């Protein structure tokens, strides 16, 4: 299958890409950083997911995994608006089989930073919208909403023992 994943240079996105490659799928990554994966089944585009006008032309995506995300002043633009732009460009078409949006437990709990929670809550609502729209293609759209994940993005909360304990308690 042709799998498109955003945010593939590290953390969750890189792990997902490697698993699909190990299973023999064709994987295409989009990230602001250079490729962190070297594999014959992997193609990588360096671009900012927020820049809808300069997204690469990729036809017939079968699986889309929206993983690119952040926890800073760009939460709404990257976590929500860019995810919508990517999905509208690549998933709303007859070849799609599955869309997976990497959300956050914060979409359900409201904990952590206000803009981050709002962005991930928006992802949850948009996931439901897309699920209804692509069902006619026989496709599904789901959101995976993990709690605290040990990635560089979460360093600001991991390094705060009190905040990290709160997150672990809620998730």
Positions of PLM-derived features:
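Catalytic loop of short-chain dehydrogenase/reductase
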Residues: 98-122, 127-136, 148-149
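Short, flexible catalytic-loop segment of classical short-chain dehydrogenase/reductase
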Residues: 145-156, 165
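Rossmann-fold cofactor-recognition segment
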Residues: 40-51
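Conserved NAD(P)H cofactor-binding loop of Rossmann-fold oxidoreductase domains
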Residues: 67-72
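Catalytic Tyr-x(3-8)-Lys segment
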Residues: 161-171
């Amino acid at each position: 299958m042709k799998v498109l994943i955003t945010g593939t240079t590290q953390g969750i996105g890189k792990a997902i890409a490697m698993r699909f490659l190990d299973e023999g799928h064709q994987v295409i990554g989009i990230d602001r950083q250079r490729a962190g994966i070297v594999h014959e089944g992997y193609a990588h585009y360096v671009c900012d997911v927020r820049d809808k006008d300069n997204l690469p032309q990729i036809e017939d995506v079968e699986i889309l995994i929206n993983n690119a995300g952040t926890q800073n002043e760009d939460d709404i633009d990257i976590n929500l608006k860019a995810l919508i732009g990517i999905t509208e460009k690549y998933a709303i078409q007859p070849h799609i089989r599955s869309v997976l949006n990497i959300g956050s437990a914060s979409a359900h709990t409201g904990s952590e930073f206000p803009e981050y929670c709002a962005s991930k809550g928006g992802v949850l609502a948009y996931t439901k919208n897309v699920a209804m729209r692509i069902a006619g293609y026989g496709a599904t759209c789901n959101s995976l909403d993990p709690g605290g994940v040990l990635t560089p993005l979460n360093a600001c909360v991991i390094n705060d023992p009190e905040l990290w304990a709160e997150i672990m308690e809620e998730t």
